[in-house]
Amino acid sequence: MSPTAEESLSFSCRIARTENECSRYFSLRREIFCAEQGLFASDDRDAWDGLATPIVCLVASPRDNPDAMPRLAGVVRIWEEAPGDWWGGRLGVAAEFRTAAVVGRRLIQHAVGTARAWGARRFRATVQKPNVAFFRRLRWDSIGQLELLGRPHDLMEACLDRYVPTDEIRGIPGIAGQVAAKGTTGKGERSSAELSGRDAA
C-alpha cells in the first residue's frame, strides 16, 4: 500500500474489549514478534498480559460493505508497574500498513494519552534500535541502552505534556487477561526475574 493510500484510510484506536478483538490482537502479535521477527519461538504472551490493557488500531469498514469486520492495523499494550509509573510494549503494525507510519503514530498517541488520562506521571518503553528515531520524532527521550532477546534497545521515556489524555474508561483487566492466560503455560511465559517492566518490543 502506498503512503498516500494509507493516509486516506480512516483509522481509529481503542482498547480491545471483546474476545474477538483480543484474539485478533494476540494473533497479530504472534505474526509480528514470532513468525516475522523471531523474537519468540511460537508465542509472545507473558505474565504482563494479565495486567496490561490491550489497544488496537482498526481500519474503518468500506462504505460499500459497512457490515464487514474492521481490519486490524496494529497493536500495543500498556500497564502500570507502580502507582503513576506506566510502561508500553508489544507495539506492532501489520505489514500492509507500514508505509506512512500513520498506524504506529496513532497507537503511541493513544497508548500514552490513555495512560496519562489514568494518572501516569511517567511512561517508558524499551524500543528496538531501528525505531528509536521514530520515537524521538514523537517527543520521546532515550534514557539508557540495553540488550533484550539478543537485540539492542533504547530505554525511552515519553514527554507526557506532549500527549493529549484520551477519554478511555479504566476497567479491571478481564477478557484480555483470560485470552492471554490460555497461552502463558509454556514458551510464552517469562520468569519473575525478567518481569522488570522492560518489554522486548
Language-model features and meaning:
Residues 52, 118-120:
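Short, high-confidence coil segments that cap the C-terminus of an alpha-helix
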Residues 20, 83, 129-133:
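Short alpha-helical
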Residues 30-67:
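Active-site rim helix/loop that mediates acceptor-substrate recognition in acyltransferases
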Residues 93, 99-113:
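Conserved acetyl-CoA-binding loop-helix of GNAT-fold acetyltransferases
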Residues 51, 84, 149-153:
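Short acidic/glycine-enriched loop/turn segments that link adjacent beta-strands
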Residues 88, 123-127:
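Conserved hydrophobic beta-strand within the GNAT/NAT acetyltransferase core sheet
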Residues 56, 65-80, 84-92:
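Conserved beta-strand in the GNAT
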Residues 1-14, 65, 116-117, 129-201:
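Terminal substrate-recognition subdomain of acyl/acetyltransferases
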